């Protein structure tokens, strides 16, 4: 049985967000770095640091929380893995789903790298739908 690194990232971010943790540490691979760059660019996380420990690289993510009188609120409302190792889901650029009418984002793996649904529509390419965030 293989290891699903994308599902691991999504689960650890979702769990840390639900428990209002400030930082989390995930293993660093090319796919995880590209997904984290998209999350940083879209404003779902505040900061990313690369950390080395015993010849292994980790990414330390600082999650973004809104403050109010009761304490920190969640920023990431929902993260969902769409394509998984047992059931891959592909889409061309015309049929990429819109999440909440464009309020959320879909992360795709294309022939030109990992990108959001907006970037894929602008470039006119489709790919594997990895996850959705809203």
UniProtKB/Swiss-Prot annotation:
Recorded GO CC terms: chloroplast; ribonucleoprotein complex; ribosome
Keyword Chloroplast (UniProt): yes
Annotated transmembrane regions: none
Localization annotation: Plastid, Chloroplast
The keyword Plastid belongs to this UniProt entry's keyword annotation: yes
Origin: domain of life: Eukaryota
Keyword line: Chloroplast, Plastid, Ribonucleoprotein, Ribosomal protein, RNA-binding, rRNA-binding
Main localization (coarse): plastid
A GO molecular-function descriptor: rRNA binding
InterPro entries registered for this protein in UniProt: Ribosomal_uS8, Ribosomal_uS8_CS, Ribosomal_uS8_sf
GO terms of biological process kind: translation
The family this protein is said to belong to: Belongs to the universal ribosomal protein uS8 family.
Protein's job: One of the primary rRNA binding proteins, it binds directly to 16S rRNA central domain where it helps coordinate assembly of the platform of the 30S subunit.
Subunit structure: Part of the 30S ribosomal subunit.
NCBIfam families given in the database record: PRK00136.1
Name of the protein in its database record: Small ribosomal subunit protein uS8c
Organism expressing this protein natively: Gossypium hirsutum (Upland cotton)
Gene: rps8
């Amino acid at each position: 049985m293989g290891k699903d690194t994308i599902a691991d990232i999504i689960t650890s971010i979702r769990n840390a967000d639900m428990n209002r943790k400030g930082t989390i540490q995930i293993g660093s691979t090319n796919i995880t770095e590209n997904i984290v760059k998209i999350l940083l660019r879209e404003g779902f996380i505040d900061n990313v640091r690369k950390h080395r420990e015993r010849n292994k690289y980790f990414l330390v993510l600082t999650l973004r929380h809104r403050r109010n009188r009761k304490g920190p609120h969640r920023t990431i409302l929902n993260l969902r893995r769409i394509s998984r190792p047992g059931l891959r889901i592909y889409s061309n650029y015309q049929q990429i789903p819109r999440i909440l009418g464009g309020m959320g984002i879909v992360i795709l793996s294309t022939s030109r790298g990992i990108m959001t649904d907006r970037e894929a529509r602008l470039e006119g390419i489709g790919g594997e739908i990895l996850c959705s965030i809203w």
